[in-house]
Amino acid sequence: MSAAKNILLFGATGTIGTFILDALLPVRSQFGRIAIFTSPHTAKTKTAQLDKLKKQGVEVIIGNVEDEEAVKSAYAGIDTVISALGRNTLAQQILLIRLAAASKDVKWFLPSEYGTDIKYGPASANEKPHQQKLKVRAYLENEISRDDLDFSYVVTGPFAEMYLNLVPGIEEAGGWDVKARKAVLLGDKGAEISLTTMKDVGTLVLNTLLHATGETRNSALCVNSFTTTPDKIQAEFERQLGGQEWDVSRTSLARLRELETEAWETGKPAATGVTLRRIWTEGGTLYAKRSNGAIGEPKVMGLEEVVANEIARVSKL
């Protein structure tokens, strides 16, 4: 199988797309073309950022992702497409996939799968936050021939940085407030959770591109930075901050489920986040084996560095 050579990235200036592009640029010489597809609005509001990217050898293609002709034109000469579209625009990937399969050039598509595993177990099919990703997967797997387009799902589990933050308006749903020295731990004391930093999402996507094998194509690659527990995270905060006293409470899984139901019934914007935290607390991030080895076992971040970064971030606020 041929490795990625000419790459097009959708959502490059978004939350995760930025980290993916940041991982690609230092090894720019290993690829032919690196292009991004961005909206006219972004072209107007992020001019300085796009100009900097152009100087780094990135092609900037301006268009609307719903404009078939614009997307077809962008696909010319591209063999690998990476989507980093956000949760609210996931369904737009179906058009991007259809056009990629019809293109004579595009051979590999990485949809926006960064985050919770949407096919972890039987219950996953009914989880509200998963529905758009499930539709995209169903289309890609059932409606598109592998003769026309290969795929890879880079499944990272929760982002470490976001997991650390208390859920706005629903603090019982877990997180850490470094300034207030307050922590809400989820689940039983020994309950593990697997996390991936946003920087490592970029690293893991890059290494997927560099390892085009039968194992990495047409499969879900469940990768991560590290596995820990809420109690270990708390202990690391206390260690780095000199053992200062914290206000620590714990939310049981049963209580988290109650909070989830209440959030959906009252229409709280944080409902999706609470559902995801319930899934993670149930163990929906844990595997007997990771796919990091299939993509070259890249160097990733650890708990100590993540906690240090969070402390540094908060100190600047």
What are these regions (language model features)?
Residues 70, 76-112, 128-142:
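NAD(P)-cofactor binding segment of oxidoreductase domains
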Residues 72, 198-206, 300-311:
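Short, amphipathic alpha-helical "lid/cap" segments that border enzyme active or binding sites
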Residues 253-317:
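A hydrophobic C-terminal alpha-helical subdomain
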Residues 28, 43-44, 51-55, 78, ...:
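N-terminal Rossmann-like NAD(P) cofactor-binding subdomain of oxidoreductases
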Residues 2-33, 37-48, 68-69, 116-245, ...:
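Oxidoreductase cofactor-interface core, primarily capturing Rossmann-like NAD(P)-dependent enzymes
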Residues 8, 61, 110:
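Conserved Rossmann-like nucleotide-binding pocket used by diverse enzymes
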Residues 47-78:
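Conserved Rossmann-fold cofactor-binding substructure of NAD(P)-dependent oxidoreductases
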Residues 35, 59-63, 152, 246-254:
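General small-molecule cofactor/ligand-binding pocket signal
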